[in-house]
Amino acid sequence: MEVTDVRLRRVNTEGRMRAIASITLDHEFVVHDIRVIDGNNGLFVAMPSKRTPDGEFRDIAHPINSNTRSKIQDAVLTEYHRLGELEEVEFEEAGAS
């Protein structure tokens, strides 16, 4: 299984969420609402979840092994950092005009 596409939108919120992503797996299956969170130990990826009646959050979809989790996290965070670099370049170019 490979992550074949990542669509990411940065968000400006008061909380720790930094972006929301959708990934495509093997050009065949899409998972929406993956969140990039700024945790105590750096950025991490949180899978889509919903709140249960007792207030807990349960993942709607999630990888079942650490290798797959790493592939997803690496792909999403790579795109997150790539977009950050693009925004910095665009900001610098706009300031240079």
Swiss-Prot record:
Keywords per UniProt: Cell cycle, Cell division, Septation, Sporulation
Gene Ontology process terms (BP): asexual sporulation; division septum assembly; sporulation resulting in formation of a cellular spore
Top-rank lineage group of the source organism: Bacteria
Family under the similarity heading: Belongs to the SpoVG family.
HAMAP family per UniProt: SpoVG
Function noted in UniProt: Essential for sporulation. Interferes with or is a negative regulator of the pathway leading to asymmetric septation.
PANTHER family, sorted: SEPTATION PROTEIN SPOVG-RELATED
Full protein name: Putative septation protein SpoVG
